[in-house]
Regions:
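Amphipathic alpha-helical packing segments from all-alpha helical-bundle domains
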Residues: 123-148, 154-161
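A secondary-structure capping/hinge motif
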Residues: 63-65
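N-terminal intrinsically disordered/low-complexity leader segments
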Residues: 1-17, 188-205
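Basic, helix-initiating cap at the start of DNA-binding domains
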Residues: 1-52, 67, 72, 76
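Hydrophobic alpha-helical segments that form the core
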Residues: 4, 142, 153-174, 185-197
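Hydrophobic alpha-helical connector segments
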Residues: 75-115
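Residue-level detection of the helix-turn-helix DNA-binding "recognition helix"
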Residues: 46, 60-61
Length: 205
């Protein structure tokens, strides 16, 4: 059996400085070893060196620990779009930004393939995925609307959701494979198979 993750230490006499991604990584390792349902806040507290009360104050639910990397991924997504010209093909822009959003994801890189395996196998975590990624999906939908003026809002959101599902499917396959190679490369390879074309009402026949 794998050893327990090293504690996320805090300095005595000072307010707790909590690293959400380090706590999330520790929780995911415990879930992979012991099972999600069998791991409580006290277990996560013992693994991180942070009191259960403090953990529950910072995280709205145990499931939220699986998605602590979403804010950083959303920032990478929007920052990448700012560097991309508006006149490049939409599929190229979306692929570049989505890949950038996962390329430096500390949770994916540090937790390894068991992150996606745990999420895929635990219904509570899988059901929380779309809700947790809502800020990321909304940011992607806004960018699609900016690059395709006149496109219906529903279409922009549908395409954004499709890219979210495609990226997660690529990460699931990457995790099941070992994982070997880069998670960003796995996402890039899958998204290259997508060719999104949005027709605005003015362009419709």
């Amino acid at each position: 059996m794998a050893s327990d993750p090293p504690p996320v230490r805090r300095r005595r006499g000072r307010p707790t400085v909590l690293d959400p991604e380090a706590v999330g990584t520790a929780a995911l390792r415990l879930w992979a070893e012991r099972g999600y349902g069998a791991t409580g806040w006290d277990d996560i507290s013992a693994a991180t060196g942070i009191s259960a009360r403090t953990l529950m104050r910072h995280f709205p639910s145990k499931a939220a620990l699986a998605w602590v990397g979403v804010p950083a991924a959303t920032r990478r997504l929007t920052e990448t779009f700012r560097t991309l010209p508006l006149d490049i093909p939409l599929s190229d822009a979306l692929r570049a930004a989505v890949v950038a959003s996962v390329s430096d994801d500390a949770l994916v890189l540090s937790a390894g393939g068991y992150w996606m395996r745990v999420v895929a196998e635990e219904p509570e975590l899988a059901e929380a995925s779309a809700r947790a990624y809502a800020p990321w999906t909304e940011a992607l939908a806004r960018e699609i609307a900016r690059r395709r003026p006149g496109a219906p809002t529903a279409i922009c959101h549908a395409v954004a959701a499709a890219y979210r599902e495609a990226a997660q499917a690529a990460l699931y396959d990457w995790a099941r494979g070992g994982p070997d190679g880069s998670p960003a490369h796995a996402v890039d390879a899958l998204l290259r198979l997508l060719d999104i074309r949005i027709t605005t009402p003015e362009e419709a026949p």
